[in-house]
Amino acid sequence: MIQLHSVSKAHGAEILFLDASLAAFRGERVGLVGPNGCGKSTVFRLIMDQEQADGGQVSVERNATIGYFSQDVGEMSGETVLEASISGAGEVSEAGAELKLLEHAMADPDRADELDRLLERFGVVQSRFDELGGYALEARAREVLAGLGFREAVIDEDVGKLSGGWKMRVALARILLMRPDGLLLDEPTNHLDIESIIWLEHFLRSFEGALIITSHDREFLNRIVTKIVEIDGGNVISYSGNYDFYEQQRAMAETQQEAQYARQQAMLAKEKAFIARFKARASHAAQVQSRVKKLDKIETIQLPKRRAVIEFDFREPPRSGDDVAKLQGVTKRYGDLTIYQNLDLMIRRRERWCVMGINGAGKSTLLKLVAGAIEPDAGSAVLGASVKLGYFAQHSMEMLTAGRTVFETLQDAFPVSGVGSLKALAAAFGFPGDDVEKRCEILSGGEKARLILAKMLYDPPNFLVLDEPTNHLDMDTKAMLIKALENFAGTMLMVSHDRHFLRALSDHVLELTPDGLLTYGGGYAEYVVAAGHEAPGIG
């Protein structure tokens, strides 16, 4: 249904693809993977005819509708969340809008002489609107918006009041309501919580069209895709199966290619040695010439291009006291809304707590209380003896200084550290080479998050409070962060929508419920078994 055949594309001197082919047919769910900047979003823009290929052919099945979700959602205002979702839902919303115009036209006495033509057109549009499920559109829109985390009261409020992340959800709802023949989803999980991600998984698994998706959420890809297409170094390679299977296949292919390379190098060395030894002897001239021709015809096997995965050995944090954080009798309100009433919590040294709860349950509020970013209305929240706190929150990124580069930011924080050490730190967090000269004001959200985490972990605290630390991080950076934190000798309290991250790092779970706190002695994997759900609010 969607095909790229022998496509080449470059941005300036940088070659993204060379003679690359890719296909997605109805019923296929394709995960598009590769390092940042490899050209994943460019593939979507080529399919949508927003960019042109330098060579080859991009084709979409005739009359097929394509829904494209990108991170650029545009302006939203002047209508309710529900109206904004419906108005951008493609052909069905266009048909609904035309029906309303036709109804007004037919009721206009000044257009009585056009009534027959208007009635005929109304019948055609109404039939198409019905065929597209238009009469159930509002009900479907409410269902999709609820699945994406919108409370009923918010659905009928002004979309202009929403934050950027919630507007992203509205944009995603629009695309899902289109019921297109093909879906292109570029990082759809970036602004979703676990409950919404799980709902989206169910929705996409039942989608019957062609799906091409990018995501840094490993678990999400594993549950959805039937094929992985990797873009790396100008090459586009397809693998059957989910993300885990792709990694296994890729590793096996690399091992086989390395073995073939080694065998060929040994053979070439042997042949070259023979030629060098006998090239001056007339009695061996025919054999030497034969072997020279043989070498000329051999297609040289290259070593596989391995992605540079940079590791960084973080220092051991100072030891804290055994009691790291204590909340006693804590009450917290926002206006008339009570978030906590008489809450008690003790966090002890080297425990790794992840906090679960539906939207609005107070996960971020709990982390702010523990970190001292806000005060309780009643009760106490105190840190224990010798606790050195590291608090990562989304607003942390606003504290970077405009005009300073990545390297200067690290140097300002650690003036006595060597240049080599700081550049190694920057590279480990996704700023290799000249990227350290990027100024803070031009960094993306993900780059800012990586820089804040680099600053925090270089001189590590012994108590990490992390509010969505993996937002916008690519898989390689997440893997590096997980490996670093697996060996972290301190205490952790975290909120994350990344289930792979939670599984790897947590050993205690705190669930916020309307009836108070529920605690689980095992990590996230044990919580799923014990609670019977992957997240609160999921049956």
Range-by-range predicted roles:
Residues 249-304:
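Intracellular alpha-helical coupling/juxtamembrane segments of multi-pass membrane proteins
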Residues 1-261, 308, 314-539:
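ABC ATP-binding cassette signature C-motif
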